[in-house]
Regions:
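Short hydrophobic beta-strand element within catalytic cores of glycosyltransferases
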Residues: 232-235
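Conserved active-site histidine-acidic residue motif and adjacent donor-binding/catalytic loop
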Residues: 180, 188-205, 213-216
Length: 305
């Protein structure tokens, strides 16, 4: 199958960029499964040796499906956009993945695939594919250190304040790796935005990853990054997190007090169980296989399912 994957961004991303990293993982997964892949993305994109790159200015990707069609190679089977399209290019089967939450008052774009069962349900759909990543990018470590980790944007909806408050109450060191620097003291250490090897090392060494989401997470990519590293998750029951974090690999609660009380439970969880769950459910190959099934449905029936 010849799949055209379209992104607004330059790939791979510099810094964190969760959706962009998922796109790269998908391209690599499709190529590894033997599919032909063409990438439409910003100039400077360098993703996979096995994929053809077509550089497109961002404004042309955003303008219209008619503009987009100009860049789709002859003979392509399907377009997979990672940004909203009001309609697909004429004569080209297409799907699109929604990486965020859609405004309720705005009509949902056609052929939309969501990131989790909860994400789909909240938008009146049942069509979803869980995100996946390449396990080779993460370091498995069975022996953990005595500090906790918060990884990602320091926005209130990500709940970093809960992790900070827990560190203050318990005295346990919390390392925060994120893109905006507030003022932290005491048992909280801020290390800035991290990626690549440095992020992998932090994830592998941490006692647990905090994911105390205060919003309905469409997915929550740091969660599976932690699991690949053998690191359990401490978080809330919001959005997709209950689909990812089972009792064998983490602790989910509704309040900060409950999370603090249950916090020591993460030390009893088996790092190998965390890694195995991620390898079963959340690799780039599993994600690619699940998308291919949807592509095949669209090509055969014109419908997502």
């Amino acid at each position: 199958m010849h799949v055209v994957v379209a992104s607004h961004h330059r790939l791979p991303v510099e810094g964190y960029g969760g959706p962009q990293r998922v796109v790269v993982a998908l391209v690599r997964g499709l190529a590894a499964l033997g599919h032909r892949v063409t990438i439409l993305a910003q100039p400077g994109t360098k993703v996979v040796e096995a994929a053809k790159i077509v550089e497109v200015a961002p404004r042309l990707l955003k303008d219209s499906s008619a503009n987009l069609k100009k860049f789709i190679p002859d003979g392509a089977d399907i377009l997979h956009a990672h940004f909203p399209l009001k309609q697909g290019p004429k004569g080209v089967p297409f799907v699109q993945t929604l990486h965020g939450n859609w405004k309720p008052e705005t009509p949902l774009p056609p052929n939309t695939i969501f990131l989790s069962r909860d994400h789909a349900k909240r938008h009146g759909s049942t069509i979803f594919v869980h995100n996946g990543l390449d396990p080779a990018e993460y370091i498995f470590r069975g022996r953990k250190e005595k500090w906790d980790l918060f990884l990602g944007k320091l926005h209130s909806d990500r709940g970093y304040q809960w992790a900070v408050e827990a560190a203050k109450r318990t005295g346990r060191l919390l390392i925060i790796a994120g893109g905006w620097r507030p003022s932290f003291t005491g048992s909280v250490k801020y290390v800035g935005e991290v990626d690549g090897k440095r992020k992998a090392v932090l994830l592998a060494r941490a006692r647990c990853l905090w994911m105390p989401a205060q919003w309905d997470e469409p997915f929550g990519l740091p969660t599976i990054e932690a699991l690949f590293s053998g690191t359990p998750v401490l978080g809330t029951r919001r959005g997709a997190l209950p689909e990812i974090v089972t009792p064998a690999v983490g602790v989910l609660r509704d309040t900060l007090d409950e999370l603090i009380l249950a916090g020591d439970k993460v030390t009893t969880l088996d790092p190998r169980a965390c890694r195995e769950r991620a390898e079963r459910q959340f690799t780039h190959l599993v994600m690619a296989e699940n998308y291919v099934r949807i592509y095949q449905n669209v090509l055969q029936t014109g419908e997502l399912q």
